[in-house]
From Swiss-Prot:
Coiled-coil segments on the chain, per record: none
Record-listed ATP binding positions: 32-40, 55
Biased composition (Polar residues): 360-372
UniProt similarity note: Belongs to the protein kinase superfamily. CK1 Ser/Thr protein kinase family.
Annotated PROSITE patterns: PROTEIN_KINASE_DOM
Protein name: Serine/threonine-protein kinase spe-6
Source organism of this protein record: Caenorhabditis elegans
Gene Ontology CC entries for this record: cytoplasm; nucleus
Physiological role: Serine/threonine-protein kinase which is involved in spermatogenesis. In spermatocytes, regulates meiosis and the localization and assembly of major sperm protein (MSP) into fibrous bodies. In addition, may suppress the initiation of spermiogenesis downstream of spe-8, spe-12, spe-27 and spe-29.
GO molecular function: ATP binding; protein serine kinase activity; protein serine/threonine kinase activity
CDD domains tied to this protein: STKc_TTBK
Gene Ontology BP terms: male meiosis chromosome separation; regulation of protein localization; signal transduction; spermatid differentiation; spermatogenesis
Residues of the active site: 147 (proton acceptor)
Impact after mutating residue 106 to N: In hc186; restores fertility in spe-27 mutants by rescuing initiation of spermiogenesis
Length: 379
C-alpha cells in the first residue's frame, strides 16, 4: 500500500486500498467527512475509474463500532432497489472499511433548500412511497433501522436521481430469529435513534419493532410536508422525555387537529393505523401505500410528476455537485450546522434505562453483530 495516511493512520488522497481476497484496488480521491472514529471518502476503481463511496471506521478507542452493521445490512439487501450496492469490505490494522455505491445529497439537506423548508405535495408523497417500500424491504430481510429520518435517505446521481436510497444502518438490529419469528421484547432497551423521530415507545426505553420504524417514517413525512416538527426546538439531550410527551400530546385534541392542519387527511388515518399496530404485528404496508395514493388523488396530483430537485435548477445543481462528491448525510449536517442548529443528533443513550434488563439490552446488541467477521473480506 502507499503511504498517504494522516496522523491517525486513516487514508488520505492518493492512498491505494487493496482488497484482501481479490485483485481489486481503489484509489482515494478525497475525504468528504472526518469524525473522531470514522471518515467517508470518494474512491475510484484503479482499472475502470468508476467512483464509489468508502466508509472507514477506526478500530482503536471506538467503544461502539457500527460499520459492521452497515456491512451486514448492505449484504442482506444486496440487489434490492433503493439500497446502495455493496462492493467490498475489509480491514487493516488501523481501520475497517466498506466500499459501496456513491449516492447524492440527503433528503434533509434538500428539504432545507426549499421555501418554508418543505417539499411540494407531489414530491413529498413520492418520497414517502419510496421510503415506505425501502422499510418494507428492510423488514422483510429481518432488520430494523431504528433511525428513520430524512438525513438517512439520499437521492441517486445521474440517471438514478429520481430514486431514493436508504443508508446508514449504525443503529440497525435483527428483529427475527433463524425461523423468521419476531424476537420477544427485552425488559428494557437503550434509547436508539434520533430524538425528533424515534417512536414514543423508545422514549420509555422499550424495545423497538417494525411499527416503530414506521412511526419515525410518519414523523419524517409530516416534516417533509409541513417543515420542522412542533418539538424541533426542544433540546432532547437535556430532556428527551419532553419530546416524547409532545408526541403523545398530538394524538389528542385540540393538538391533533393543529398537528394535521395543512396535510392530507389520510395522514390522520395513518397515525391511527400505526397506533393500533402491536409489537408482534406485521405492519399493513399496502394500506399505508394506498392512503398515500388516495391523498394524491384527492389533491389532484400524480405520483409520476418530476421531483422538486428535477424541476428546480438550484436544487438540481446542488444534487449533482454533492452527488459527485459522494457526500454522506454526516457531511451534509456538518455543512448545514449553522442553518440547522436545533436538529437532533444520533444517540445511543440519553439517560439509562431501568437497571433491570440493562445487561440483556447491551448483550443483545453485541450478539446481533458478532458474525460480521465472516464478511469483512467479502466482495
Amino acid at each position: 500500500m502507499s503511504e498517504q495516511r494522516d496522523s491517525r493512520g486513516m487514508p488520505q488522497a492518493g492512498f491505494i486500498i487493496e482488497h484482501q481476497s481479490s485483485d481489486h484496488k481503489w484509489k482515494v480521491l478525497r475525504n468528504i467527512y472526518s469524525g473522531p472514529f470514522s471518515d467517508v471518502y470518494v474512491v475510484a476503481d484503479t482499472v475502470t475509474n468508476e467512483k464509489y463511496a468508502m466508509k472507514c471506521e477506526r478500530q482503536e478507542g471506538n467503544s461502539r463500532p457500527v460499520l459492521k452493521l452497515d456491512v451486514m445490512v448492505l449484504m442482506a439487501t444486496k440487489g434490492l432497489r433503493g439500497f446502495p450496492n455493496f462492493v467490498a469490505a475489509g480491514r487493516t490494522d488501523v481501520y475497517r472499511y466498506c466500499i459501496m455505491q456513491l449516492v447524492g445529497p440527503d433528503l434533509g439537506r434538500l428539504r432545507r433548500t426549499r421555501p418554508e423548508r418543505k417539499f411540494s405535495l407531489p414530491t413529498a408523497l413520492q418520497i414517502l412511497g419510496q421510503t415506505l417500500r425501502r422499510l418494507e424491504d428492510l423488514h422483510n430481510c429481518g432488520w430494523l433501522c431504528r433511525d428513520v429520518k430524512a438525513p438517512n435517505f439520499c437521492i441517486g446521481v445521474g440517471e438514478n436521481e429520481s430514486t431514493v436510497y436508504i443508508l446508514d444502518f449504525g443503529f440497525a438490529r435483527k428483529f427475527v430469529d433463524k425461523e423468521g419469528k419476531i424476537i420477544p421484547p427485552r425488559t428494557a432497551a437503550a434509547l436508539m435513534g434520533t430524538f425528533q423521530y424515534c417512536a414514543v415507545s423508545a422514549h420509555s426505553h422499550k424495545d423497538q419493532c417494525a411499527r416503530d420504524d414506521l412511526e419515525s417514517w410518519f414523523y419524517m413525512g409530516i416534516e417533509l410536508l409541513k417543515g420542522p416538527l412542533p418539538w424541533a426546538n426542544i433540546d432532547g439531550h437535556k430532556n428527551h422525555k419532553q419530546i416524547g410527551e409532545a408526541k403523545v400530546a398530538i394524538r389528542s385534541e385540540p393538538l391533533r387537529s393543529e398537528f394535521f392542519e395543512g396535510v392530507p387527511k389520510q395522514f390522520n388515518e395513518i397515525l391511527t393505523i400505526l397506533d393500533q399496530t402491536s409489537y408482534f404485528d406485521r405492519p399493513n404496508y399496502k394500506k399505508l401505500g394506498d392512503l398515500l395514493s388516495q391523498a394524491a388523488t384527492e389533491h389532484q396530483v400524480t405520483l409520476k410528476e418530476p421531483l422538486d430537485w428535477q424541476n428546480n435548477e438550484r436544487m438540481q445543481q446542488k444534487a449533482i455537485f454533492v452527488g459527485e462528491l459522494g457526500e454522506s448525510h454526516q457531511a451534509s449536517a456538518k455543512l448545514d450546522a449553522k442553518d440547522n442548529a436545533n436538529e437532533s443528533m444520533d444517540i445511543e443513550f440519553d439517560d439509562m434505562p431501568p437497571k433491570e434488563g440493562i445487561s440483556k439490552s447491551l448483550s443483545a446488541e453485541k450478539s446481533c453483530t458478532k458474525n460480521v467477521e465472516t464478511a469483512r473480506t467479502e466482495k
